């Protein structure tokens, strides 16, 4: 490392205030686990007292799931050039089944490490990777199948419960019954239940042993619905500092995992900066980087190049790999009559390779070799849907479902090696065909977690595909999808900027939460109930703070009612002071209380009084001023 900080290191000394300031109205809290070093972060939203007019009771703070890591904690000094604290390092080391290497195993990684020309963009702190001891398997699935509850499993159990036991107000606990379509929704998540779900293959806990900075989370249909955000540079846009900032921006608004899809310069170095500063799991599509190593010529790819890329990324700490092993030679002709053919970048790369060599996909033929690498680092499979439909006309065709059947076959093979696995799904699917996708995935893949891109429910809205896809995402999340991959307004049009990322995440947080409500996930409705109570009581700041995007809510309110006094007003800009339905309802309740009646009696009596008053004034609709 150079003695003087590089330009990149200077940029990385701090992030912009917009992505590191605390989220309005809340603070970071930590829930203590069974051991001193197991503290689970949550976001506690402070609530104000109910106005005397509405009863005057205290409203206790509400805890919610938090993906933002230490970036929203004012007690933590952030230095991107150092990276985050290795939260899980001791848990990994104490298991005694891994060893620290003397250096990188990947030939590409070693070459980058010794290239002085990269000093200006290299992550400053050198970290030696770990790997499983000879003959060991270090996956969370392996531990789970041996009856071991790891600290990571306890961590996610605490996290999923969101301190629901602290909510004692029965009105906040009220919840409509859900329809879970056969899912095993629990009233309370226990560490043992987490272990059982991972052992069964119905959930994954993606935590590479070389990403100790990550805060454990779980993906499975019996848990909260998660969302993924994509970032990554390209040959024409964005540098390392911008990508790290996009990472932090993504998790601030609720990204549960982030995929680095970089295809431009310095892919290796960009990924190192991202992983060292990420409190959430990081996923990649290794074939993208492998293609860069052969100058973009798909036919020049080899198993040896791909294998070296897997090891390179596993030793950096990538938590899950998208592997397009289901794109088989026999399926490629099935796409010929499609409207949009093969739209997956990874799928098209492997299809081109298969056709160029007229051989079976080497990711398929070497699948068990890949499993050996995955279990040595605890990298999870995200089995890619390389033949997903790129328009609703192509939905649910033979190519898509043929690949899905192969992914089911590969899932069972991965499970034989105790490798955690989830399945990627479409794509573009009209609403009436969505459930068929979910049902077939559950059947073919043994209930392994489904991870879907949308699906987009119509093709006519370029610029608004975060909406067209959030509709499908809410539906498929309700039917059983475990994680939803966000779509931004720039989908099909260009690379997203920071605002596009925020808009995409918000659309998908809404979809995921709507799915949890529909499934009947325990406590899912508490936040809705708390916000509704705040709305009825005109606690404006509490309404903002309980929302998914407090800053946007306040910004919209302030456009028409900017004064501080308006935060105490018993009306909003939509109806004004005289036509607010909630104010009228409260007036009825006050009248009832004053006259010892129930609400219905008060409304009837009040109407009679108003009728008499109207007649006494001459029964004129319009009175002269």
UniProtKB/Swiss-Prot annotation:
Cofactor comment text: Binds 1 [4Fe-4S] cluster per subunit. The cluster is coordinated with 3 cysteines and an exchangeable S-adenosyl-L-methionine.
Enzyme Commission code: 4.1.99.17
Purpose of the protein: Catalyzes the synthesis of the hydroxymethylpyrimidine phosphate (HMP-P) moiety of thiamine from aminoimidazole ribotide (AIR) in a radical S-adenosyl-L-methionine (SAM)-dependent reaction.
Annotated catalysed reactions: 5-amino-1-(5-phospho-beta-D-ribosyl)imidazole + S-adenosyl-L-methionine = 4-amino-2-methyl-5-(phosphooxymethyl)pyrimidine + CO + 5'-deoxyadenosine + formate + L-methionine + 3 H(+)
Superkingdom per UniProt: Bacteria
Encoding gene (name): thiC
Pfam family for this entry, one: ThiC-associated
Lineage: Bacteria, Pseudomonadati, Pseudomonadota, Gammaproteobacteria, Lysobacterales
InterPro entries: ThiC (IPR037509), ThiC-associated_dom (IPR025747), ThiC/Bza_core_dom (IPR038521), ThiC/BzaA/B (IPR002817)
Keywords linked to the UniProt accession: 4Fe-4S, Iron, Iron-sulfur, Lyase, Metal-binding, S-adenosyl-L-methionine, Thiamine biosynthesis, Zinc
Family the UniProt entry places it in: Belongs to the ThiC family.
Pathway: Cofactor biosynthesis; thiamine diphosphate biosynthesis
Protein's UniProt name: Phosphomethylpyrimidine synthase
Record-listed substrate binding positions: 230, 259, 288, 324, 344-346, 385-388, 424, 451
Organism: Xanthomonas oryzae pv. oryzae (strain KACC10331 / KXO85)
